[in-house]
């Protein structure tokens, strides 16, 4: 019987070869000394035959250790030819740049600098629509900014120019009297509505009590009325509806400014300049087809009241020290 030595080889000899080897060893120990050489030769023959069978894989009980995978070395890569190039390409690692600079969005102040007026207005209005809670804060900020008459006039000129640019080019757009047809109104309606709404918004923000100067209010009112008279008319009466409504509102604004000026004590000594503003209104009323008749009638009422108060002062000298409530502005100042 064989004894274990504490480890196993990479292969184990077959059972038949092992038994024959043991039998040969027993025979060599029991024979006489004169047969020792023959027994050694026989045992040696059995060992060679068993090694030959194991070498050619005839044993069915071959046991081997699992082979461990290893990486290709530089020598293996150089010896394998085309295969080595593929392995080298797969196993190659790309360099990793850890300290590289990434792009970043443009800061908000720089973005605002690059925006034009239309884009900035669109972004601001969309922001207010999406977040109505900020409307009050934005409104407070805007109200703290004061705008002058020149800025108002510039914007109105641009919008009036846009109205004329929207007139379609066709010889059939105008009639013999210069009125535009329905097709032209359909093309121009958006710009006309924008102009009319802008006129009313600017006027309401430039009259008392929003404005402290009645003189500036009347001057801008005169300019706005002149712009409105330049708006084209249309053949169909319904297409002139928006323009007529705007004239009605402007007529009421004229009356409000006139009443405010007449009750302002700081202008009580300039009643003689009332004729200047009356002349301006007569000119505007003639161009607008008598749509400003109401403020003209109000001026006539104020003139009559001023004349009556003047007669009272002449008949009662003591009343001259009492302040008068009638006053107006000088358009030329």
From Swiss-Prot:
Biased composition annotated in UniProt, kind: Polar residues: 14-36, 47-58
Keyword field: Cytoplasm, Nucleus, Protein transport, Transport
Cellular localization per UniProt: Cytoplasm; Nucleus
GO annotation terms (biological process): nuclear protein quality control by the ubiquitin-proteasome system; proteasome localization; protein transport
Pfam families listed in its UniProt record: Cut8
MF annotations from Gene Ontology: proteasome binding
GO cellular component terms, semicolon-separated: cytoplasm; nuclear membrane
InterPro entries the UniProt entry points to: Cut8/Sts1_fam, Cut8/Sts1_sf
Region span, Disordered: 1-76
Main location per the UniProt record: cytoplasm
Described purpose of this protein according to its UniProt entry: Involved in ubiquitin-mediated protein degradation. Regulatory factor in the ubiquitin/proteasome pathway that controls the turnover of proteasome substrates. Targets proteasomes to the nucleus and facilitates the degradation of nuclear proteins.
Entry's family note: Belongs to the cut8/STS1 family.
PANTHER family recorded: FI02826P
Quaternary organization: Binds the proteasome.
Entry protein name: Tethering factor for nuclear proteasome STS1
Source organism (scientific name): Kluyveromyces lactis (strain ATCC 8585 / CBS 2359 / DSM 70799 / NBRC 1267 / NRRL Y-1140 / WM37)
Lineage of the organism: Eukaryota, Fungi, Dikarya, Ascomycota, Saccharomycotina
């Amino acid at each position: 019987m064989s004894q274990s030595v504490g480890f196993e080889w990479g292969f184990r000899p077959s059972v038949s070869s092992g038994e024959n080897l043991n039998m040969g060893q027993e025979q060599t120990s029991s024979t006489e000394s004169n047969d020792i050489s023959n027994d050694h030769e026989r045992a040696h023959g059995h060992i060679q035959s068993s090694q030959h069978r194991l070498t050619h894989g005839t044993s069915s009980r071959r046991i081997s250790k699992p082979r461990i995978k290893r990486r290709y070395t530089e020598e293996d890569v150089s010896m394998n030819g085309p295969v080595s190039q593929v392995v080298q390409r797969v196993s190659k690692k790309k360099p990793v740049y850890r300290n590289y600079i990434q792009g970043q969005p443009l800061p908000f102040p720089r973005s605002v600098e690059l925006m034009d007026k239309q884009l900035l207005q669109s972004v601001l209005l969309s922001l207010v629509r999406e977040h109505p809670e900020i409307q009050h804060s934005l409104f407070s900020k805007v109200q703290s900014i004061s705008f002058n008459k020149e800025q108002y006039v510039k914007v109105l000129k641009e919008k009036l120019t846009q109205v004329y640019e929207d007139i379609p080019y066709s010889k059939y757009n105008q009639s013999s009297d210069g009125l535009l047809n329905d097709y032209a109104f359909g093309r121009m309606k958006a710009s006309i509505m924008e102009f009319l709404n802008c006129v009313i918004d600017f006027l309401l923000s430039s009259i008392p009590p929003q404005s402290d100067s009645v003189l500036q209010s009347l001057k801008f009112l005169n300019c706005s009325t002149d712009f409105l008279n330049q708006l084209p008319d249309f053949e169909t009466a319904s297409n002139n509806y928006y323009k007529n409504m705007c004239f009605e509102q402007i007529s009421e604004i004229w009356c409000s400014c006139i009443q405010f000026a007449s009750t302002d004590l700081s202008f009580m000594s300039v009643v003689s300049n009332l004729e200047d503003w009356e002349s301006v209104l007569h000119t505007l009323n003639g161009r607008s087809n008598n749509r400003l008749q109401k403020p003209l009638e109000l001026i006539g009422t104020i003139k009559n009241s001023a004349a009556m108060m003047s007669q009272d002062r002449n008949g009662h000298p003591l009343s001259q020290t009492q302040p008068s409530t009638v006053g107006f502005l000088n358009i030329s100042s």
